[in-house]
Amino acid sequence: MWFFARDPVRDFPFELSPEPPEGGPPGPWILHRGRKKATGSAVSIFVYDVKPGAEEQTQVAKAAFKRLKTLRHPNILAYIDGLETEKCLHIVTEAVTPLGTYLKARAEAGGLKEQELSWGLHQIVKALSFLVNDCNLIHNNVCMAAVFVDRAGEWKLGGLDYMYSAQGNGGGPPSKGIPELEQYDPPELADSSSRAVREKWSADMWRLGCLIWEVFNGSLPRAAALRNPGKIPKSLVTHYCELVGANPKVRPNPARFLQNCRAPGGFMSNRFVETNLFLEEIQIKEPAEKQKFFQELSKSLDSFPEDFCRHKVLPQLLTAFEFGNAGAVVLTPLFKVGKSLRAEEYQEKIIPVVVKMFSSTDRAMRIRLLQQMEQFIQYLDEPTVNTQIFPHVTHGFLDTNPAIREQTVKSMLLLAPKLNEANLNVELMKHFARLQAKDDQGPIRCNTTVCLGKIGSYLSASTRHRVLTSAFSRATKDPFAPSRVAGVLGFAATHNLYSMDDCAHKILPVLCGLTVDPEKSVRDQAFKTIRSFLSKLESVSEDPTQLAEVEKDVHAASSPGTGGAAASWAGWAVTGVSSLTSKLIRAHPTPVPSDTTVPQRPVPEGNPAPAPALAQAIPATSGHWETQEDKDTAEDSATADRWDDEDWGSLEQEAESVLAQQDDWSAKGQGSRAGQINHPDHKSLESHWSSWEVEGSWDQGWQEPSSVEPPPEGTRLASEYNWGGAEPSDKGDPFAALSVRPSAQPRPDPDSWGEDNWEGLEAESRQVKAELARKKREERRREMEAKRAEKKTTKGPMKLGARKLD
């Protein structure tokens, strides 16, 4: 009945593209573009329409359908699906382009490189070797029209219409009846009386010679043209002549031909072919071989075709990371290939892998990700950054390796615009406060200050008011000179985020104190910044109506537009200090010696001041730092590929243990100021200035003279005067926080950046401290005496044996 009849073409899971057909090999087939209905993936569809009176061609088409369906080889056109009806034949294969069309398109774009042609011919010869040596089949149709190219640039052998068995099963070679194909037949086939001895591969190797001639010289006009090699490379001419020789006996086996061309200096002996051969066998390679291969791959990617990198190298890189435990070595080639991808492809293929990499505990992989974040940050959306990446990145702030801490700080420049309110204004500020106050590496403290200045415009108004002034003020007390410069430039970079009252009462007093800094670079930047703030104050003083315009950004929401200004002010610090940090880390991971981190106050006139050791590494002005940026960047890039050679260890150490260790630092070294100066031991010195409890200890190292002389009797310290008049405390004393030590008030939260953490607390007299210390010593002495008395009166056996008799 009619309603049981169904159209098999309509139910076929593939459909033809409305675009006109691409043509195809001379013969019955017409090549169409197509797609799979379910997924939309691209395919190629070979269509043959059955016509009355063409039974011979129909049998040829059906034989080709059967051969292609049963033959599986990487260099033979891949069969996907097929449809056979009384009216038509459909063969669905991977998406391919005829070689002639491909070469013409590439010629318009500059032509194929010799290495691409060598690999393409290598694939065709390898397919012939498979057919002749493994399957005992004669292709009988090797020509330009029988070769196709997939999207990765891989050459595939098709055109199996006239294939027959080399053993004679099923009769001789089928008749072609197409003049365009018969011109590729070897001369011995044209002479029916010829009794020359030939091998089973002789005819196909002749046709291979014709293919080589056409690849380099264009369409073959006649067989006599084969005598002139034309544009065939010299390294291939000798082997080509063997293929088109009149004696079929001397034509080499396909395997032998490959071996000859792969010899040193041969046409198929190059880096591109070597890379492809390794990728084909990568699943059976040893881990050490894979590591070496991926390390060297990046150098070659620039010379490889873009389609090859996208469609062949990239899948292998993703597979190597997903299942092969390749580690950090895949990152550099992965991101290099990613540059050629469209945004949609990048999101689909690389971003899921990157997100997974951030959860790795491999230090080398983590630092590579941080170093190369600029290449993929634009493809990350905000939810992914806040929920899947930022929580893992913050572990780097607590890492024991200085290089990871530094790269984590730098990465915040890229992540900050995508962070939400909680992560940016709360979580990140906690880590920055801890690094700036406690980190034992001066360059890391410096870069923390620089980073804060660059991302200041992204902070909320309340966070800016609470954090920026206090953080930059603390940086100006750092014994590391570049940190003090960074603090000054931080004020300058964020000048539009402060009210006029803050400029006059909080910022200018701090900057004025730096005009007598021992380092000229600090003094120079301080004077420049002071003039900038004074000009603003003066303009508002002359015209008070400008106040609203000047302070428009103070209470505004985050304003990313000012980030560029911040970057230009402080762009020198990240690069310049990065190279210094790298040198320190490569030399030894221990902290910098105290005599280089704590500059001394200049000696009086008349005595030549010794040049500090750090002066060689610290430039005199910020302009010089900018000139060093290119050289430092080159040095960092030169050393970037050496991270795998170092023993990074694991990140499995709990963050709590690191925090506990840092809290222990703050409990050490509560000695006197004189002790800080007279003892050059670096560890004890660091414990003083890195403590959260000691507010002013960063500036004590260089504000004190090199030799401490007792003041005349009766002399009072400046901070002991009541500058405010009637008030007994130092509430009105703006200088008290610079010279006195905090009182024994409740300790502030070390993870907070509130005002109480940064402003000076009420001073405690030295007599009270001495009295407390004396009481503790007396109490300890009494405890020890009581224990000794108790031991003397104890009778009976002791813990480790019987009591000796008198």
Curated annotation (Swiss-Prot):
Residues 586-642, 663-806 are annotated as: Disordered. Residues 14-314 form the Protein kinase domain. Expressed in diaphragm, quadriceps, thymus, liver, lung, spleen, kidney, heart and brain. Prominently expressed in neurons, and enriched at central nervous system synapses and neuromuscular junctions. Gene3D superfamilies: Leucine-rich Repeat Variant, Phosphorylase Kinase, domain 1, Transferase(Phosphotransferase) domain 1. GO terms for cellular component: centrosome; cis-Golgi network; COPI vesicle coat; cytoplasm; cytosol; endoplasmic reticulum-Golgi intermediate compartment; Golgi apparatus. Keywords: Coiled coil, Cytoplasm, Cytoskeleton, ER-Golgi transport, Golgi apparatus, Phosphoprotein, Repeat, Transport. The keyword Signal does not apply. One of its GO terms (molecular function) is protein kinase activity. PROSITE patterns: PROTEIN_KINASE_DOM. It holds the Pfam family Pkinase. Residues 601-611 have a biased composition (Pro residues). It is found in: Cytoplasm, Cytoskeleton, Microtubule organizing center, Centrosome; Cytoplasm; Endoplasmic reticulum-Golgi intermediate compartment; Golgi apparatus, cis-Golgi network. Residues 752-762 have a biased composition (Acidic residues). It comes from the Eukaryota. Residues 791-806 are annotated as: Interaction with COPB1. SMART domains: S_TKc (SM00220). GO terms for biological process: inflammatory response; neuron development; protein localization; retrograde vesicle-mediated transport, Golgi to endoplasmic reticulum; spinal cord motor neuron differentiation. The protein kinase domain is predicted to be catalytically inactive. It is linked to Defects in Scyl1 are the cause of the muscle deficient phenotype (mdf). Mice exhibit progressive neuromuscular atrophy, hindlimb paralysis, gait ataxia, abnormal hindlimb posture and tremor. Pathology of mdf comprises cerebellar atrophy, Purkinje cell loss and optic nerve atrophy. Regulates COPI-mediated retrograde protein traffic at the interface between the Golgi apparatus and the endoplasmic reticulum. Involved in the maintenance of the Golgi apparatus morphology. Homooligomer. Interacts with GORAB. Interacts with COPA, COPB1 and COPB2. Interacts with AP2B1. This is N-terminal kinase-like protein. It comes from Mus musculus (Mouse).
